[in-house]
């Protein structure tokens, strides 16, 4: 079976350059790739977009097809920033992908995410395409601004520099709106969808009622399997809460700040709230702290920046509870990784999170933007340690089954084979 992946993440591909710094999302794609490349009778090719000129190359039993896109000049960035994002290129990367299809001759194409710019291939090839549902843009667009915020929140900066920074979020909102409209039209061309939550099933069947849905769970990063079930309630004076965020408006930093303030002023519980993924200098930190008049440091919030898998695993094992405060999400692997370690988890009842957490059994659910309820649940976890530990144990049992590598690989291969059987002579492009 010849499998072509279209991914914004280059997977296991290694360059001669030093390891890249920055956001560490997408590691699960590399983990899934590790499973595929060690199977028999399967050939994997991976296509990704790069700003560095590169050629087709074979590594790790994978054929890599880089698509080169020249870096944008400052002028091009300015044009896109102030309205150019509205001009969606419906044929972007299409010619290159069709050439790759001709060269590799895949039996099936696996497209990672409807938000993937390579989704232009949908409806343009006779090779069956299965879409791996990730962050769905239309629901994200709907939940973009937290309660109490809108575009006008970003229009009155104190300096020219902040005007540029804050309008970066307005640009992000405008961009996600335009891309979500494109996503809606592309969903009409989806024949096969792959997901793992009740939420992504519902959204896909609403926007692509003609599509066939396959349930395939996701592989997590290696250190979390190596430390599965090893969490024990830390014996320390201060309680540690941990969250993993990106510098995105709807990830819930505002909820954390409001909850931390409540926890400090309405209880005598000593705590520290660790936030991985963003640094103290991040513009989103300055924005929310100023708008809410809450300084993170004064309410025991500590920003530790981006952590690799080993660092994050260590931080989680040293914490008492994991909190996921996002306003929208499908199946956040940060929750899954915490559960696999055995850590008690509190997540917002949004998107697909309720498919990961059964309230009162494998974790706790709280409404989005509910700092009072979240503060109460945190106090329960701190004062009723046996209850919190039991939540962690049940979450671990669920996560071990959900993220079983053997089962995931079996489900994925079966999905590929099922789709291929439904299609004949898939190698010609339209």
Predicted regions: what is each one?
Residues 1-56, 428-430:
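N-terminal subdomain of nucleotide-sugar transferases
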Residues 32, 154-193, 202, 206:
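Membrane-proximal helix-turn-helix segments that form the acceptor-binding/catalytic region
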Residues 373, 380, 387-402, 408-414, ...:
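A short, well-ordered alpha-helix in the C-terminal region of glycosyltransferases
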Residues 285-310:
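Nucleotide-activated donor-binding/catalytic signature segment of Leloir-type glycosyltransferases, i.e.
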Residues 327:
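Aromatic "clamp/platform" in nucleotide-sugar-dependent glycosyltransferases that forms part
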Residues 359-360, 364-371, 380-385:
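Conserved acidic donor-binding segment of nucleotide-sugar-dependent glycosyltransferases
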Residues 4, 232-251, 257-260:
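Conserved donor-binding/catalytic core segment of Leloir-type glycosyltransferases
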Residues 344-347:
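Short hydrophobic beta-strand element within catalytic cores of glycosyltransferases
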């Amino acid at each position: 079976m010849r499998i072509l992946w279209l991914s914004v993440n280059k997977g296991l591909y290694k360059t001669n350059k030093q390891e890249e710094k920055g956001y560490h999302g997408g590691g699960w794609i590399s983990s899934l790739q590790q499973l595929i490349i060690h199977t028999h009778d399967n050939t994997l090719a991976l296509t990704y977009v790069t700003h560095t000129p590169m050629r087709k190359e074979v590594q790790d039993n994978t054929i890599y097809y880089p698509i080169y896109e020249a870096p944008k000049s400052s002028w091009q960035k300015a044009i896109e920033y102030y309205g150019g994002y509205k001009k969606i290129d419906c044929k972007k990367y299409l010619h290159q992908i069709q050439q790759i299809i001709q060269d590799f001759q895949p039996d099936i194409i696996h497209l990672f995410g409807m938000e993937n710019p390579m989704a232009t291939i949908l409806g343009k090839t006779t090779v069956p395409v299965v879409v791996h549902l990730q962050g769905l843009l239309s629901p994200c667009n709907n939940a973009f601004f937290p309660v109490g915020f809108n575009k006008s929140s970003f229009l009155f900066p104190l300096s020219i520099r902040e005007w540029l920074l804050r309008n970066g979020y307005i640009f992000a909102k405008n961009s996600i709106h335009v891309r979500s409209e494109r996503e809606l039209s592309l969903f009409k061309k989806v024949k096969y969808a792959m997901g793992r939550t009740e939420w992504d099933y519902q959204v896909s069947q609403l926007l692509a009622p003609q599509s066939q849905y396959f349930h395939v769970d996701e592989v997590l990063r290696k250190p979390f399997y190596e430390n599965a079930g090893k969490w024990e309630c830390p014996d320390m004076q201060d309680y540690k809460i941990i969250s993993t965020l990106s510098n995105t408006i709807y990830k819930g930093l505002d909820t954390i700040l409001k909850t931390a303030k409540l926890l400090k002023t309405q209880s005598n519980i000593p705590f520290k709230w660790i936030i991985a993924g963003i640094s103290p200098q991040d513009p989103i930190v300055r924005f929310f702290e100023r708008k809410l008049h809450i300084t993170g440091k004064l309410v025991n919030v500590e920003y530790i920046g981006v952590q690799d898998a080993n660092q994050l695993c260590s931080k989680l094992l040293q914490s008492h509870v994991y909190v996921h405060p996002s306003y929208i999400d499908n199946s956040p692997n940060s929750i899954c990784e915490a559960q696999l370690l055995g850590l008690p988890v509190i997540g917002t009842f949004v998107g697909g999170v309720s498919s990961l957490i059964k309230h009162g059994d494998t974790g706790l659910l709280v409404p989005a933007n509910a700092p009072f309820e979240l503060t109460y649940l945190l106090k329960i976890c701190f004062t009723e340690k046996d209850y919190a530990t039991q939540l962690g144990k049940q979450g671990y049992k669920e996560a071990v089954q959900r993220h079983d590598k053997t089962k995931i690989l079996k489900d994925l291969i079966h999905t590929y084979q099922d789709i291929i059987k439904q299609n004949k002579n898939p190698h010609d492009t339209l």
